[in-house]
C-alpha cells in the first residue's frame, strides 16, 4: 500500500452500531483524500496507516481490511472504503466490533492504544515470566483465567479468540479464578501463552482470520467457530 494516494472515501453501506469512529465518519473524506500512505505499523490490537501531512488512520480490534485490484467487484457491505490513484481500493468491515479512526495531527487519543504502545509485546523476548507474574499479582483475585488474558488489553493484542487456544494448551479451565492458580499452573500458562502466539504468528495467523488479500491464516484453531461442533 505504500506510495498509494487516496482519491475517494466512501462511508458505510451498512451502518454497524459497534463500529466506533472518532468524530464524524462523514468528515473522513476531508481528512484523507489526497493523502499518500507512507507506512504501516502494529501495536497490540491496533494498526496504524501513516499518511502524508502527519495524518494517521488507526484501526483496532475486530476490523477486517481487504485490498482489491482495479476492476475487482466492490463488496455490497462495508464500514469504510478508500480508493487509490491506481483505481485499486481498500475495504474495511466489522463483524463484532472495532475502531476506525482518523487523526489529523498524529495524536491518538485512545487509552487502549496508549497501553499497547507502552506495554511489552508477548512475542518479545523481553516479555518474561517475571512480567507475567507481575500481571497475575496485580490482578483482582476474583478474576477468571480467561478474563486475565482477554480483557482490558492487559497483554497487548491478546483477546478472546487467541485466549481459547492458549487456555486449552495450558489445560486450564477458563472460569478458574486467578486466586487458585498454583505456581505450576502459572508457569504452564505463561509457556502456553508464548508458544501459542508464536505458532499463530509463524503460520500467518489463525484460520478464522484473513489477510489483506483474503487468504486465511495457516494456524488451525483448536477452539473456534470452525471447530465447536467437532468432538474433543
List each model region and its residues.
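A short, charged helix-loop
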Residues: 98-140
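Acidic, proline/glycine-enriched N-terminal capping motif
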Residues: 1-114
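Basic, nucleic-acid-binding surfaces and adjacent catalytic neighborhoods in DNA/RNA-processing proteins
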Residues: 7-27, 41, 46, 133, ...
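Short, mixed-charge, low-aromatic patches
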Residues: 86-93, 117-125, 144-152
Amino acid at each position: 500500500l505504500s506510495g498509494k494516494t487516496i482519491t475517494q472515501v466512501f462511508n458505510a453501506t451498512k451502518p454497524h452500531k459497534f463500529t466506533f469512529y472518532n468524530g464524524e465518519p462523514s468528515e473522513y473524506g476531508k481528512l484523507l483524500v489526497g493523502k499518500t500512505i507512507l507506512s504501516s505499523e502494529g501495536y497490540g490490537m491496533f494498526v496504524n496507516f501513516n499518511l502524508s501531512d502527519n495524518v494517521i488512520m488507526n484501526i483496532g480490534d475486530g476490523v477486517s481490511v481487504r485490498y482489491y485490484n482495479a476492476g475487482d467487484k466492490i463488496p455490497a457491505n462495508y464500514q469504510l472504503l478508500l480508493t487509490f490513484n491506481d483505481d485499486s481500493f481498500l475495504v474495511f468491515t466489522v463483524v463484532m466490533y472495532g475502531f476506525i479512526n482518523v487523526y489529523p495531527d498524529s495524536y491518538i487519543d485512545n487509552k487502549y492504544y496508549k497501553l499497547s504502545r507502552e506495554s511489552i509485546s508477548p512475542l518479545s523476548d523481553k516479555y518474561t515470566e517475571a512480567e507475567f507474574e507481575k500481571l497475575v499479582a496485580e490482578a483482582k483475585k476474583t478474576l477468571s483465567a480467561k478474563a486475565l488474558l482477554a480483557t482490558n488489553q492487559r497483554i497487548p493484542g491478546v483477546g478472546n479468540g487467541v485466549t481459547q487456544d492458549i487456555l486449552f494448551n495450558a489445560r486450564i479451565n477458563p472460569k478458574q479464578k486467578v486466586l487458585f492458580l498454583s505456581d505450576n499452573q502459572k508457569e504452564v500458562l505463561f509457556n502456553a501463552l508464548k508458544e501459542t502466539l508464536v505458532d499463530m504468528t509463524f503460520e500467518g495467523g489463525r484460520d478464522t482470520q484473513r489477510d489483506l488479500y483474503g487468504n486465511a491464516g495457516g494456524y488451525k484453531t483448536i477452539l473456534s467457530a470452525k471447530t465447536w461442533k467437532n468432538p474433543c
